[in-house]
């Protein structure tokens, strides 16, 4: 949700607002805008981890693995598919939570899927994404990145155009499709996972892959 110039992250009980141009307001934070010119996500990942001081003492290995996968997948989507000239990443690591945002001003994830798959609207694009098999460039990517990233998160938000997909993974998964005002040009991904999460990415892959 966007309120004025602030972006809302998290669920209702743990909501927070931040300026995407400045990054998160607390914890070990890092924000940087990159020119989308031969970017390599693994190098940005290494830089981001170093800048927020991420290590085994403040982030368990299984949570670190979730972050590495989710951040790399969402950044790869922006690099390969958005056609955006610039990509902005924001991260924060505090005593309870690891969060990141990947944002571009490109074609927009829902709009791209609607056009490529000749769907009626953004809701149909979301339904297709949640099947776990969708990509707008199948020769370049498996298309499962958004699906599995949404399963790894405590809270996952995918915002583009007039639409937000909001997923909360507690004892059960809660999924909602919300209206965005003002509209989001391009795509914004907001990902949050607890440092104390018991999820393991290998278990998530086993649960949903056949």
Where are these regions (language model features)?
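C-terminal end segment of the histidine kinase catalytic
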Residues: 158-160, 174-207
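Bergerat-fold GHKL ATPase/HATPase_c domain
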Residues: 2-3, 7-72, 203-210
């Amino acid at each position: 949700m966007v309120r004025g110039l602030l972006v809302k992250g998290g669920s209702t009980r743990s909501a927070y607002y931040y300026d995407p141009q400045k990054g998160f307001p607390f914890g070990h934070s890092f924000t940087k805008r990159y020119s989308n010119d031969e970017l390599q996500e693994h190098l940005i990942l290494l830089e981001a981890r170093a800048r927020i001081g991420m290590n085994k003492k403040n982030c368990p290995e299984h949570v670190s693995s979730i972050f590495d996968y989710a951040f790399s997948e969402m950044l790869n989507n922006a690099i390969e598919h958005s056609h955006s000239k610039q990509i902005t990443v924001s991260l924060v690591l505090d005593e309870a939570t690891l969060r990141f945002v990947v944002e571009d001003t490109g074609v927009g994830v829902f709009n791209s899927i609607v056009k490529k798959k000749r769907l009626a609207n953004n809701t149909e694009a979301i339904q297709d994404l949640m099947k776990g098999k969708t990509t707008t460039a199948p020769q370049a990517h498996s298309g499962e990145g958004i699906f599995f990233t949404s399963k790894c998160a405590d809270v996952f938000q995918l915002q583009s155009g007039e639409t937000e997909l909001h997923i909360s993974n507690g004892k059960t998964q809660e999924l909602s499709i919300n209206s965005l005002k003002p509209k989001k040009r391009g795509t914004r991904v907001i990902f949050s996972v607890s440092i104390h999460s018991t999820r393991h990415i290998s278990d998530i892959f086993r649960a949903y892959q056949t």
